[in-house]
């Protein structure tokens, strides 16, 4: 029976996605203009929910296409303007450059990373110890590097492990070419493969949460930290000290949670590395060590020096993150002899689809701003006073960061609080305490969903996610114990007066000094 033109259109639309998903997206495109005509505010929230739905279906269809169609329509019907979308992208150019260049830069340091992490996994047999190592290493690195950079490193390592195992389990040798995305080979043991996928899922989730634990502590850990630090006129050390009454107890609670979920094998954790897989990885390590020439050793040395430059450059903020990433690409390729354009191009394959998706995400953020979707929440939070106000801001930030980008939420809130300070609604000391509540509120509860943490969203839409069956729902479920513990410990640190008392202690001992309103007036406005 010949295919009609309408059937061909439906077949082509969003490719191999399920039919119900195609119908859902077409329905959204029909409903949205009607709702916008009746009530723009409701239409704005509807768009946010629809966009979250496209992210949740990331394994069925990459969110760029359905999310992009919704964003294009939002601009077309007037929910926001092209100039506002461009302004959002402009304001977040550093994040986009980070994705384009830093992730590609990490690609050229893969050999060193695989070398280090393979040793970690093959030499340490205790799953609990390996999990704690991944979580604490990610937290430490995220305090000095950007969380996206760290998660890109861990993803590169996981893809390396997976492809090595898949190649050998499919009956090939380490040196053979192989497509590790295809499970058609007869030799693959399904049970073994599932256990290994589960093991990698565990490590990636521990590492992802680790980036949040470390990222909240310093002003370079997350993009919104830089914005908040600029508005409050804090330097690196002062930022870390002011955050510590909340971040230190939260860090230890997070590490303890990592231990508990592994020990009691709950929320999908506790999956062991199968013995056969461990043998393959150990054999690979021995194989690599045996055939490593002086050329290979020199490459590792060069990559180690570039790694030192990367950490120093980012920790001292010698240039914007994206530009440091570009320098990593240039140094790693120049000194390791990668001069072929095709070989260079491979490095960019992983990050560019996500960069495009993030640009679409900023279009949704533009709608949130133009339709003032968060305005009622902010006004409600400002109606409280004192310590209660800090708790309310922490909770309000946390809830909004679960559904929206935490960079955006943090930026909107700090600018609103700054406006309240300049209009005399709050004191300068209260502003400083609110800045801590906003920073911790945007960083910690946002681990709940991939929407809030860019590192989680990058993990969800990366090449490794479908290979290890890491879906949106599974990420939310595996993040749940961390979400509960981090959110509660964070709110208790503020609620029980720990933040106010410790901040007063820092003032009394002249560890930090009181700031004036003049500092805020003079500070760089990073407003959207």
Swiss-Prot record:
The chain crosses the membrane at residues 29-49, 52-72, 95-115, 139-159, 203-223, 248-268, 304-324, 349-369, 390-410, 448-468, 476-496. It comes from the Bacteria. GO terms for molecular function: sodium:proton antiporter activity. It is found in: Cell inner membrane. Keywords: Antiport, Cell inner membrane, Cell membrane, Ion transport, Membrane, Sodium, Sodium transport, Transmembrane, Transmembrane helix, Transport. Signal peptide: none annotated. Pfam families: NhaB. Its main location: membrane. This is Na(+)/H(+) antiporter NhaB. It comes from Shewanella woodyi (strain ATCC 51908 / MS32). The gene is nhaB.
């Amino acid at each position: 029976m010949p295919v009609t033109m309408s059937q061909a259109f439906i077949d082509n639309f969003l490719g191999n996605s399920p039919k119900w998903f195609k119908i859902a997206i077409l329905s959204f495109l029909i409903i949205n203009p009607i709702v916008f005509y009746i009530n723009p505010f409701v239409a704005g929230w509807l768009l946010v929910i629809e966009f979250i739905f496209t992210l949740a279906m990331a394994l069925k269809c990459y969110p760029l296409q359905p999310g992009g169609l919704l964003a294009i329509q939002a601009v077309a019907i007037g929910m926001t303007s092209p100039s506002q979308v461009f302004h959002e992208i402009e304001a977040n150019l550093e994040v986009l450059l980070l994705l384009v260049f830093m992730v590609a830069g990490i690609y050229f340091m893969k050999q060193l990373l695989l070398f280090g992490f393979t040793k970690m996994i093959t030499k340490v047999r205790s799953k609990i110890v390996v999990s704690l190592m991944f979580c604490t290493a990610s937290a430490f690195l995220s305090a000095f590097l950007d969380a996206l950079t760290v998660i890109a490193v861990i993803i590169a390592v996981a893809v390396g492990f997976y492809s090595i195992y898949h190649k050998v389990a499919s009956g090939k040798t380490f040196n053979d070419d192989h497509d590790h995305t295809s499970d058609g080979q007869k030799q693959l043991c399904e049970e073994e493969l599932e256990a290994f996928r589960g093991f990698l899922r565990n490590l990636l989730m521990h590492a992802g949460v680790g980036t949040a634990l470390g990222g909240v502590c310093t002003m370079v850990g997350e993009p919104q930290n830089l914005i908040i630090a600029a508005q409050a006129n804090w330097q690196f050390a002062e930022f870390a000290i002011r955050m510590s009454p909340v971040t230190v107890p939260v860090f230890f609670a997070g590490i303890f949670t990592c231990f508990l979920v592994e020990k009691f094998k709950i929320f999908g954790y506790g999956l062991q590395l199968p013995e056969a897989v461990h043998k393959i990885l150990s054999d690979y390590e021995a194989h690599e060590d045996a055939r490593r020439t002086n050329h290979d050793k020199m490459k590792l040395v060069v990559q180690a020096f570039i790694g030192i430059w990367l950490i120093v450059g980012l920790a001292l903020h010698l240039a914007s993150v994206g530009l440091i990433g570009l320098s990593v690409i240039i140094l790693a390729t120049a000194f390791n002899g990668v001069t072929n354009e095709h070989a260079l191009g491979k490095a960019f394959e992983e990050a560019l689809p996500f960069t495009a998706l993030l640009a679409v995400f900023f279009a949704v953020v533009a709608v949130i701003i133009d339709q003032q979707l968060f305005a009622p929440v902010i006004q409600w939070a400002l109606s409280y006073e004192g310590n209660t106000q800090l708790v309310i801001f922490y909770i309000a930030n946390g809830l909004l960061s679960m559904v929206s980008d935490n960079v955006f939420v943090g930026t909107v809130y700090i600018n609103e609080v700054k406006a309240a300070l300049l209009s005399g609604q709050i004191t300068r000391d209260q502003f400083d305490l609110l800045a801590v509540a906003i920073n911790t509120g945007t960083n910690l509860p946002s681990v709940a969903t991939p929407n809030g943490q860019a590192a989680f969203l990058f993990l969800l839409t990366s090449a490794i996610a479908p290979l290890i069956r890491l879906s949106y729902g599974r990420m939310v479920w595996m993040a749940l114990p961390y979400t509960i513990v981090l959110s509660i410990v964070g709110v208790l640190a503020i609620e029980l007066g720990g933040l106010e008392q410790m901040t007063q202690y820092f003032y009394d001992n002249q560890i930090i000094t009181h700031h004036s309103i003049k500092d805020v007036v003079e500070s760089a406005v990073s407003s959207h």
